[in-house]
Regions:
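Shared catalytic-loop signature of beta/alpha-barrel
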Residues: 42-49, 61, 203, 220-338, ...
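Metal- or metallocofactor-binding catalytic centers and their adjacent structured scaffolds
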Residues: 20-98
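Structured beta-strand/loop patches that form or line metal/cofactor-binding pockets in enzymes
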Residues: 1-28, 32-33, 323-325
């Protein structure tokens, strides 16, 4: 079997690739380099002359070839390699009529625990905190056992440290009250703070027992990120913008974090993310893949989650279930706060060709 054709799709703000073989079996993948999907498409187009004619089962060889063909690295390149890798695993699963997780060593769980994204910014007003409280209660009633928010007020950069801490505490308190003590809460900072402020804030909210405190600072320095993990008493998570096994190795070797957060659509696909999971396992660190870009990357993440021992919970957005994704046909089944281990061959996602070709491309406004 050989790779015969590669189709690219820019739909909504996403880049999706379809790899078609001479046997008629096709696979789909998606990049998580969501700020620059056109650039990812340009790289995939450059890779076509390398890929066409290749055996799609030679996944590791292709992954290494694409990574090392040119002496350059970066998230756009890795985002392109990642979506190709996911599509190749999809082809392999379909050919052998088995789900991808079975090709990764088999399953170690029958369902995947989710943590629900309740939203990015809730602000600092009483009414918004009341809304957060109600949203948390509803999510728990729907069966979710872990909830995630960005707790910082939207004007965080204009506040004194005292104001920032007090208003963030108020928001976290509303989340904890709505969620109750039987539900885990997760706090995502989106790289907004300095190391000094991060440490102070993390210590101030530890009374609410967050599961972890995620991405407090910019990704510029691995050493600085690891240093925070050593200074605070609540678990730290980061890694969603990293794109190689070596970055994760150095992050962990420098003392942190307790949770690693690769994105399967950015960190080298299923092939490299599985390696990152093993590196993390050797440090007694858990893998919680970053994910909010739709059913393709949710499915790719779930196949990894099912096959590794050091999984805790999977990031999940209800946007996966919205009509906006009607150009994708998903076999994933959510029951309350869990996705049932998929049994369909391959990834379990198909493209609706009639619809995807009509979906407009709406790139992210970088001025927003």
């Amino acid at each position: 079997m050989k790779i015969e054709k590669i189709n690219s799709y820019l739909a909504r703000d996403q880049f999706i690739v379809e790899i078609i073989t001479d046997k008629g079996i096709s696979g789909v993948g998606q990049s998580a380099c969501w700020a620059y999907p056109e650039a990812v498409k340009a790289i995939v187009d450059r890779f076509k002359n390398i890929l066409i004619g290749k055996d799609p089962f030679m996944i590791e060889e292709i992954n290494q070839l694409l990574m090392r063909t040119g002496p350059f690295r970066g998230s756009v390149l890795s985002g392109a390699i990642s979506c190709i890798d996911i599509a190749l695993w999809d082809i392999k699963g379909k050919y052998f009529e088995t789900p991808i997780w079975n090709l990764l060593g088999g399953k170690v769980r029958n369902k995947v625990r989710l943590h629900l994204l309740l939203g990015i910014i809730y602000g600092n007003s009483k009414s918004k905190n009341e809304g957060l409280y109600e949203s948390a209660k509803k999510a728990v009633k729907d069966g979710f056992t872990a909830l995630k928010i960005d707790p910082l007020p939207d004007n965080y950069y204009d506040l004194s440290l005292d104001q920032l801490i007090k208003e963030t505490i108020s928001t976290v308190a509303a989340l904890r009250e709505g969620a109750g003590s039987e539900v885990d809460i997760i706090l995502e900072i989106h790289r907004k703070l300095t190391p000094m402020t991060s440490v102070h804030l993390a210590e101030s909210i530890k009374e609410f027992n967050p599961m972890f405190f995620e991405d407090p600072i910019q990704i510029d320095s691995i050493i600085s990120q690891s240093d925070i993990a050593k200074k605070v008493s609540i678990p730290i998570a980061n890694g969603e913008r990293m794109h190689s096994i070596w970055e994760f190795r150095e992050l962990l070797a420098n003392g942190g974090p307790q949770y690693v957060r690769p994105d399967v659509g950015l960190a080298g696909g299923i092939t490299q993310t599985k390696k990152i999971a093993s590196i993390a396992e050797s440090y007694h660190s858990a893998l919680i893949t970053h994910n909010f870009l739709g059913p393709i990357l949710t499915a790719a993440s779930v196949h990894i989650d099912v096959s590794i021992p050091n999984f805790i919970t999977q990031e999940y957005s209800l946007d996966d279930e919205s009509e906006k994704n009607n150009y994708l046909i998903s076999s994933l089944k959510r029951e309350g706060g869990y996705i049932i281990t998929p049994e369909k061959p391959g990834l379990g996602i198909e493209i609706n060709k009639e619809i995807i070709n009509q979906v407009p491309y709406e790139p992210l406004d970088l001025n927003d």
